[in-house]
Structure formats: structure tokens, C-alpha cells
């Protein structure tokens, strides 16, 4: 079994694809139910009110509303607060 491959061969040339992680909807933005808010590995952000967590720790909106980032018990949380409908006079 040769371990030297020859003159025009290389052991390099492999790389993995980017995972495209990060915050997808920022604080104050409107979201619809089901929209992804944060893609993450582990729980860097925790789900708050109106936010669900997928099997790969992705946070998504459970209802329509505004995205809010905050803290609860020393943890960074993401909430979705419902938008108040304008009142007709």
C-alpha cells in the first residue's frame, strides 16, 4: 500500500458546506406563524412566549407578531408578541 500518491496528486481539496446559521428575523420585525427566527446549534437563544424549538434547536414563530429579544433568568430568550389590530373610531 503506497502512501505516496505520485507527482500530480494532492491530499487536500475537501471542505464542508456552510451551515447558514444565525438570526434570520431581528427584533421589531413582523413574522408569520411558522417562520424561522434563529438557526442555531445548541440553545444560544431559548424559546419564549410564542416561539417553538425544533429538533435541531431552530427557533420558529408559533403565532403572527413582532419579534422581541430579551433575557429571562439570565438566559437570552426570543418572544413573539401579537400585534394589536388598529381600532376603528
Curated annotation (Swiss-Prot):
Q: Report which residue ranges the record marks as coiled coil.
A: none
PROSITE patterns for this protein: RIBOSOMAL_L27
Q: Which GO terms describe its cellular component?
A: cytosolic large ribosomal subunit
Q: Where is the composition biased (Polar residues)?
A: 7-19
Q: Does the keyword Transcription regulation apply?
A: no
Which Gene3D superfamilies does this entry report, sorted A to Z? Answer: 2.40.50.100
What GO biological process terms are annotated to this protein in UniProt?
Answer: translation
Query: Which residue stretches belong to region Disordered?
Result: 1-22
Family, per entry: Belongs to the bacterial ribosomal protein bL27 family.
- Name the PANTHER family on file: LARGE RIBOSOMAL SUBUNIT PROTEIN BL27M, RIBOSOMAL PROTEIN L27
State the protein's name: Large ribosomal subunit protein bL27
Q: Taxonomic classification, please?
A: Bacteria, Bacillati, Actinomycetota, Actinomycetes, Propionibacteriales
